[in-house]
Each structure stands twice: as C-alpha cells, then as structure tokens.
C-alpha cells in the first residue's frame, strides 16, 4: 500500500513559548532512543520518523486501538523549525506543502495571539491539524508517568486533578467554538472530518506523545491520502531558506514534495528581481548522526533525491532566490516553468490603486501570511512585496497618505529599512512600523491607527460647535451682569469659551467668555463637572435668566446636521442625547415663529 505514497510533511505551529521546540525535541529524542542503526535519517530542515520506531514507542496505544498491521503510513517528515516563518514558506499556489499540522496550545493559558494567527493560516491553506494541549504536567496535583499514553496518565490521577484538566480543556474547546470550529478531546471525537482532536501532552514528561503520533497516522490515512500519492517525473519543491554556508557558498534549502531531483538538472525558482534559471552543481544532505565525526564535515554528497525530502542545493545565482518560492526541475523548454514561478509570485504580490498600507516581508511565504492576517484584521493593502523597504515604497505610502493619512504607512515584517529610506520617510511624513513578530507588528499599527484616528476626528470635530446643556446652580451667582458670572453644572455634552447659549424657548442669552474650575481657567467642561462661567451679552441674572434655569449651547443648524450625519459615532452618548433634545426644541421655535 505504502509504495506509491510519500511520508506526510508535518509542521508544528502555535504561540511563542508554548513549548513547540521542546515538543519537537522530545519526539525526536525519544525516537532516537528506540531507533536501530540507520533507521532515522536526517534531512535538510526535516527529520524523518519511520513508522516501525513509532510502533515500538507507542505499542500500548496501538494495542488499545488494535491498529497493529493496519497502518500504511511510512512515517513522518517533521519540519525541524517550528512556528510561522517555516510554515509560511511551505507554500504552493492555492495551498501548502505541509500535509498535517500540530497546533500547540498552552493548556494553562488557552488561546493566545499567535493561536488565532495559526488558525487563519491553517484554514486558508486547508490543512488538517491536531491540537497538542501542552504542559499537562503543570496541572496542579498532576502525577506524571513518563512517556505514557495520556489516557493511562489521566486514569492514574485523583478526581480533583482530573477535574482541573477537564476545566482547562473545556476552556480551549470554548475558544475553538468562538472561532467556528468544533473541538473535543481526541478519544471523544465522533467525526474526524468535522471535529478538531485535542491531545493533552507534556513536552517535559513525554505524556500524550504516543497518542499524538498514532492520531496523526490515523488522520493521514483518513484525510490526506490523496495528497501523498507520488506522481513521479521531474522534481517539484519549495525553497525553505537561502543562506551562505562555509565552504559551499550560497545554498538553497529545498523541500521536495514530488518527483526526482538530480545533480546537473536545470531548475527554475523565483528571485527578487525575476525568475532564476540555473543548474544544480551539487546536492548535499546531513550525514547520519552516528557518522558525523567532525562538525565541519556534516554533509554527504548525493547525486539524486526522491520526494519527499529536504535537500541543500548548490548552484550559481542563488543569492537572489526568494524563500517560499516554488522550485521546478526543467524538462525541455524552460518557458512554461518560468511562467509558473512568475504566476505563483504574482498570486502573492499586490499592486493596486486602492487606499491601503504598503506591506513588506522577507519571503513569499511570510508575505502571503502577512497579507492574509492583515485582511483578517480588516486592514486594506495597496501594495505587498518582498525585500527591504525602498524609496519607491515610501513614495507609494505618501500618495496614500495624501488621500487617507491613516493608511499611508509601511509595515515591515522581518525586513531591513536602509538609513536613506528612513530619511526619505521623515521628509514624506510616512510612518514605518517594523517588527519580526507579525501580530506585534499589527498590534503596533492598530494602536497607532486608533490613536491617530481619534486625534484626526477630534481635530475635525473642533471645527464644529458641539452640543451642551447646563443648569445654573442656585446660590452660586457671583455677578449679575456685565458680564454675568454664575456657577453651573454641565448636565450633558460640553461647553467651551465662545459658545453661544440659549434658553429652552429659543431666547438668546449670550456668549461664554471664560470657564473656571477651582479658580483656574479651562478650555472645556464636560458632563458632571461644576464650574463657574462668565456670560457676555445683554443679560442680567434675575431678569433674563434665573437660578436653576437650564440653558443649551446654540448649535448652528449646519453644524448640527454635520454632527448627526457624519460624526454621530464619535460623539459621547450624552452629546447625542443633548443634540437630539436641542433639535426637537429648535423645531418648536420654528413652528412658533410661523
């Protein structure tokens, strides 16, 4: 059965500090302890875990579910680097090279920022995933049983400890429900195609890891079988990383997911400045651990590699290649392959005339993930491209800034901003946001956006007379006229110097000259404040106005219409109430005048 199928590629994702690396290390190290010589093979960026080793390690779980002899999965190719960047680069148009994901969630903390980010990415790339609810050993009162099935460990705990675990799981299940997913503890799942299985694990004690690996084999056979069928022919892969290696020059780490790649083959990948067509001079893979005598001499040369595999490719012109790009082995005319990589890159890059931010990222994969996340947060994108921030990006952002200052910015994810570009940004008044963690970058921008929006709206609102309602406080008449000085309570809205006051019957009272609070002049008094005001105009307290009278700010009609039609959402609820009350009074004055 397994002959025409490759091993599934598995990626580990989740929030920072949830134990992704520790979990991966625990799985790998435990496997090493069970291995026979030559069984575990190290790839570039991937570790191959053969099923026979898993079978030994997870024997009690396999026995419990009577799976002996029923699993045809060869093993798992685990992506060595956990997290978003690696997962983002495991991309191909319309999906992912990863077949399965482990979403690690801290059992004691539940959903966190990057949990949501991971879910958006998994959903968009349509990848089945299993949840490792990690740090079960941190549950108060938990008595660990190293490397045991989580069900055996669970049954060995007292009732109170079991209850604490159930409560933590219930919170995670609730978080999934809020995101539109149905989730359940793995042994209670009734439909794996609809429900998300959760396995409590500990990267420290190894508990739950046997269940996790057996569950992954089951999901592979049930949900991703067709993805694993090998078509054969010329190799197809994705570029994970491009880096300088001592003694080798610029190298390209490739995950080959179909076909064959040979030394001497012509390959096509996408570069920063267009397609790169080159010939493979050399391919290397890591030596088996037991053959690695010298850290400097860690690679073995290979002439041919079959999918699925992780391989380091050495060729000319690789400096320009973009991680996350597709890579194809050329057979015959290279043009169709060139068209394909161009089309692939174009599906990620964006250039429009619309109002939106300029997004820059270091790889095609991270750019794709970035645009996806920005859109999920309701942030429009005008331009998305790879590489350091350039002067051209600043000009593009400044064009947007002139139309909408809130979106005329550059978001730089994991890329450099040259000094001269920073200077240009200062001249053009363009703000650059820079961070290596996507959600923090978006968080910084959103915080600035909201503050800037409030500032701009306040600046716009300052052009209009705002609604206000005051009552003259009995016993607080300091001067009867020329100007009248009285103590007032602001019943709703606000008052400012220069605002005209009217009575409820429409009679003009005068203009507020000054507002004082505890003897000091202030520029604005809001609802709930008691202040002294001086009123200029032909007004005498006791004749034109009396103690206890309610007065209104006389909002000009065009201001009132603008405030209601355009800025209602930005006024406080008491301002809206006073404005509506004032408009009703105003309509009665009009009727009386007729």
Curated annotation (Swiss-Prot):
UniProt-annotated stretches for the region G4: 134-137
Family: Belongs to the TRAFAC class translation factor GTPase superfamily. Classic translation factor GTPase family. IF-2 subfamily.
UniProt cross-references to SUPFAM superfamilies, sorted A to Z: Initiation factor IF2/eIF5b, domain 3, P-loop containing nucleoside triphosphate hydrolases, Translation proteins
A Pfam family this chain is assigned to: GTP_EFTU_D4
Keywords per UniProt: GTP-binding, Initiation factor, Nucleotide-binding, Protein biosynthesis
Listed Gene3D superfamilies: P-loop containing nucleotide triphosphate hydrolases, Translation factors, Translation initiation factor IF- 2, domain 3
Record-listed GTP binding positions: 14-21, 80-84, 134-137
HAMAP family: IF_2_A
Lineage: Archaea, Thermoproteota, Thermoprotei, Thermoproteales, Thermoproteaceae
GO molecular function: GTP binding; GTPase activity; translation initiation factor activity
Chain residue ranges for the region called G2: 39-43
Top-level taxon of origin: Archaea
Residue numbers spanned by region G1: 14-21
Domain (tr-type G) ranges: 5-224
Protein name as catalogued: Probable translation initiation factor IF-2
Region G3, annotated ranges: 80-83
This protein's GO CC annotations: cytoplasm
Function: Function in general translation initiation by promoting the binding of the formylmethionine-tRNA to ribosomes. Seems to function along with eIF-2.
Region (G5), start-end ranges: 202-204
């Amino acid at each position: 059965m397994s002959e025409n199928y490759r091993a599934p590629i598995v990626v580990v994702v989740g929030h920072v500090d949830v134990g992704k690396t520790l979990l991966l290390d625990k799985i790998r190290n435990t496997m090493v302890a069970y291995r026979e010589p030559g069984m575990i093979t190290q790839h570039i960026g991937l570790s191959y875990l053969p099923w026979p080793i898993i079978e030994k390690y997870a024997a009690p779980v396999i026995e419990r579910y009577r799976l002996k002899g029923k699993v045809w999965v060869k093993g798992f190719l685990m992506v060595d680097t956990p997290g978003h960047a690696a997962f983002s680069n495991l991309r191909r148009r319309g999906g992912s090279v990863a077949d399965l994901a482990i979403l690690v969630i801290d059992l004691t903390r539940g959903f966190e920022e990057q949990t949501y980010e991971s879910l958006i990415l998994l959903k968009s790339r349509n990848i089945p995933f299993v949840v490792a609810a990690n740090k079960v050993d941190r549950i108060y009162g938990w008595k660990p049983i190293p490397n045991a099935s989580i069900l055996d460990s669970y049954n060995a705990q007292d009732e109170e400890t079991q209850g604490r675990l159930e409560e933590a799981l219930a919170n995670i299940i609730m978080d999934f429900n809020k995101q539109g997913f149905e989730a359940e503890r793995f042994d209670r799942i009734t439909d794996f195609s609809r429900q998300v299985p959760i396995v409590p694990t500990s990267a420290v004690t190894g508990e739950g890891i046997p269940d996790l690996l057996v569950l992954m084999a089951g999901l592979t056979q049930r949900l991703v079988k067709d993805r694993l069928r090998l078509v054969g022919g010329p190799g197809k892969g994705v570029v994970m990383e491009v880096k300088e290696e001592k003694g080798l020059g610029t190298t390209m780490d490739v995950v080959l997911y179909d076909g064959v790649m040979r030394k001497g083959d012509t390959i096509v990948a996408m570069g920063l400045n267009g397609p790169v067509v080159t010939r493979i001079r050399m391919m290397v893979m890591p030596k088996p651990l037991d053959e690695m005598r010298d850290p400097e001499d860690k690679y073995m040369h290979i002439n041919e590699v079959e999918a699925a595999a992780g391989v380091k490719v050495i060729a000319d012109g690789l400096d320009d290649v973009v991680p996350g790009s597709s890579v194809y082995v050329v057979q015959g005319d290279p043009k169709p392959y060139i068209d394909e990589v161009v089309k692939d890159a174009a599906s990620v890059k964006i250039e429009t005339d619309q109002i939106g931010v300029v997004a820059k990222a270091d790889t095609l994969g991270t750019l794709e993930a970035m645009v996806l996340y920005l859109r999920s947060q309701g942030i429009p994108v005008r331009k998305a491209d790879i590489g350091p921030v350039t002067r051209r990006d600043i000009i593009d952002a400044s064009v947007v800034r002139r139309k909408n200052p809130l979106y005329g910015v550059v978001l730089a994810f994991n890329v450099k901003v040259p000094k001269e570009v920073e200077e240009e940004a200062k001249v053009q008044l363009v703000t650059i946001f820079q961070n290596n963690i996507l959600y923090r970058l978006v968080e910084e921008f959103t915080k600035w956006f909201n503050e800037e929006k409030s500032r701009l709206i306040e600046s716009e609102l300052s052009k209009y007379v705002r609604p206000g309602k005051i009552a003259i406080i009995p016993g607080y008449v300091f001067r009867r006229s020329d100007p009248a000085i009285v103590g007032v309570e602001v019943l709703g809205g606000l008052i400012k110097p220069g605002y005209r006051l009217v009575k409820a019957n429409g009679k003009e009272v005068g203009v507020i000259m000054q507002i004082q609070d505890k003897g000091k002049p202030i520029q604005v008094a809001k609802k709930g404040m008691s202040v002294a005001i001086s009123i200029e105009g032909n007004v005498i307290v006791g004749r034109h106005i009396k103690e206890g009278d309610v007065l209104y700010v006389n909002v000009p009609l065009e201001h009132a219409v603008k405030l209601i039609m355009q800025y209602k959402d930005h006024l406080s609820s008491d301002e809206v109430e006073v404005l509506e009350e004032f408009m009703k009074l105003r309509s009665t004055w009009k009727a009386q005048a007729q």
